[in-house]
Structures are given as C-alpha cells and as structure tokens.
UniProtKB/Swiss-Prot annotation:
The gene is purM. The keyword Thylakoid does not apply. Belongs to the AIR synthase family. It holds the Pfam family AIRS. It is found in: Cytoplasm. One of its GO terms (molecular function) is ATP binding. InterPro entries: PurM-like_C_dom, PurM-like_C_sf, PurM-like_N, PurM-like_N_sf, PurM_cligase. One of its GO terms (cellular component) is cytosol. Its EC number is 6.3.3.1. Pathway: Purine metabolism; IMP biosynthesis via de novo pathway; 5-amino-1-(5-phospho-D-ribosyl)imidazole from N(2)-formyl-N(1)-(5-phospho-D-ribosyl)glycinamide: step 2/2. The keyword Ligase applies. It comes from the Bacteria. This is Phosphoribosylformylglycinamidine cyclo-ligase.
C-alpha cells in the first residue's frame, strides 16, 4: 500500500524524515507551559499559572502570500517561516496580547525533507523572537494541487491578555502622538505588485544591486518581516498605550484608521522617518503615485503606537533601548482617515 501511495505522489517515508528533522528546531521554542511533545493529535498549553483577573485569549491567523514565489525563485526557504510567525503575532500584540503558542500549516507538491526542515527552522526562529512555543502543525503533501517545487505556508497563534489591559484604541483622542517603529523592508504584503513591477515589467535581476540598495534585489525582497512582540510587551509594562496598528496590506491608509475611534483621524508628517531605498526603487520603476505607495506598502514603518504627548519622548527612548528605530511620525486630529503634512490627503 505504501508503494501504491508513493506511486500516487505521496512519499510517507519522506514525510517521516521531515518530521524527524524539524524536531530539533521545534524544541528550541518550548515554554514551561507546554504539555506533551511534538506528534500528538493536539498541542496542549497549561494556562493555570497565569495570574490574570479576567484572562482573554486572542487569536490570529495569516499567511505569507506571494512572497513565497520569491523564495521559490531564489531557492531560499530558511527565513520565510519568520514571515509567517510575524504576520500572526504582530496582529495580536497590537491588542496587548502576549503570544503563547503557534501552529503552522505547510501544503506542498512534494515533501522534500531538507526544504521542510528549512521552513520550520524559520518558523522556530520567528517563535523564539516572539517568545511563543511552536506546539503543532500540519505538513500536507498534495501532488496535483501544487507543483513539486511549490508550497503554501500559513500559521495560527493564540495569545493572552487581562481583559482590563486590552488595547482597543477607543480612548484615543485628538492630540495623541503617533510613534512609528521602523520596518525591515517590504515585510509580507504587496508582493504581487512587487513581482509585476520589478521582475515582469522592469525585468530586474534578483542577483544585482540596484540604486541605493545595499543587498542584491533577491536578498532585499526576502528580508524577514520584523517581529515587534518583545519591545511592545516591554512598552506596555511601562506606559499606557492608547492604540496600535500593524502596518500590513493597505499600508498607512487602511491600517492606521483601524485603531482610531469614530471622529478621529491621523495626520502624518512626511520626512519624519527614513523611507528605505526599496520603496523608492519600486515607485521609480513602476511609476507609482505616492498615494498608491502609502495605500499598499508599509513605507518603512511596520508598527504605529498612539500615546499621550507627555509620554512620547520616553516611549521613543524605551523602544530604542529595546533595539527599535522609533520616530514621532504624526498626531491624531479631529476628523477621519489619514492625511499628510498639514492636512493634505494623498
């Protein structure tokens, strides 16, 4: 029967080898609350030691999107897992939640043990950066659904926060200061446009360095999404944060309003932070308007937090002590949506 399954395109032995290879990476993510080991039907996590008055679980799920196609093209698979973790944990930390555990889903056309190991190696690195345990996952070999070189990657995370400490944004008022935390680059959104502009229409090479880039284009595009969990959790211990936004698909224009209450808008001061060269390259090669750029990409800012003006300098200092590049990038105002430089809507 095993031979028949292999003839159908599913290699059970390769799957077993992949699981064996990934165990050493998964083990590095373990927390004391994890019960059982890898390979059970379900992952278990003990919540009994959390001394919270009203514990609330916060969940998030996401994928890496077409950034995966860059990994296929470059045959580099050891960092794309960081992206999968980042997209999930950054989404729940903006509500004040500490990520507890993570599960992954890998669907592929052919289970190559070394490739699967590299993917999980990246996932494990992301989990370590976020302080959460990789307690389970699924690797599905699906011949006919994907080509032998292709795979899809998604993840799921659960975190915890005391109900009274949930960050909702509902108390944001006009005059609060917006602090931006620098991104590592494009992160994990907008890659369908990136590929069209730079690779299809622009015919740029992944091996060459262009313009002010410091790395070959392929390395620049595969930079992992920054994980903000540890600095944000440290910030929440020391200061009151009124709202946070993870700048993902939809850029500034769509994501900042998600943290703002009705009647409050955001005014952003262009020039208050450095926009990385990769965005300038995209805009130049693709002849994209500035509004499009801010409506698609993070433009150098991966996370925005709203604090009182009297706390702003201390918050910037704390974040920089945590290794982040933090800048005051704007303020909240009466109104709606996002405007730039004194009320100009892009």
């Amino acid at each position: 029967m095993a031979n028949a399954y292999k003839q159908a395109g599913v290699d059970i032995e390769a799957g077993y080898e992949a699981v064996s290879r990934m165990k050493k990476h998964v083990q590095t993510t373990m927390r004391k609350e994890v019960l059982g080991g890898l390979g059970g039907f379900g992952g278990m996590f003990d919540l009994s030691k959390f001394a919270l008055e009203e514990p609330v679980l916060v969940s998030g799920t996401d994928g890496v999107g077409t950034k995966l196609m860059l990994a296929f093209m470059a045959d580099k698979h050891d960092t794309i897992g960081i992206d999968a973790v980042a997209m999930c944990v950054n989404d729940i930390v903006v509500q004040g939640a500490e990520p507890l555990f993570f599960l992954d889903y890998i669907a592929c056309g052919k289970a190559e043990p070394s490739k699967i190991e590299n993917i999980v190696k990246g996932i494990s690195e992301g989990c370590r950066q976020a302080g959460c345990a990789l307690i389970g996952g699924e690797t599905a070999e699906m011949p006919g659904m994907y080509s032998t070189e292709e795979y899809d990657l998604a993840g799921f995370t659960v975190g915890i926060v005391d109900k009274k400490k949930i960050v909702t944004g509902e108390k944001i008022e006009a005059g609060h200061v917006l602090i931006g935390l620098a991104s590592s680059g494009i992160h994990s959104n907008g890659y369908s446009l990136v590929r069209k502009v730079l690779l299809e229409d622009g015919e740029l090479s992944l091996e060459r360095i262009y313009g002010r880039l410091e790395l070959p284009l392929g390395e620049e595009l595969l930079k992992p999404t920054k994980i903000y969990v540890k600095p944000i959790l440290e910030l929440l211990k020391k200061h009151e944060v009124y709202g946070m936004a993870h700048i993902t698909g939809g850029g500034f224009i769509e994501n900042i309003p998600r943290m703002l209450p009705e009647g409050i808008g955001a005014e952003i001061e262009l020039g208050s932070w450095e926009i990385q060269p990769i965005f300038s390259l995209l805009q130049e090669v693709g002849k994209l308007e500035e509004k499009e750029m801010f409506n698609i990409f993070n433009m150098g800012i991966g996370m925005v937090v709203a604090v009182k003006e009297e706390d702003a300098k201390d918050v910037v200092r704390l974040l920089e002590e945590q290794g982040e590049m933090a800048r005051i990038i704007g303020r909240t105002i009466q109104g709606a949506g996002v405007t730039f430089n004194g009320g100009t809507a892009l």
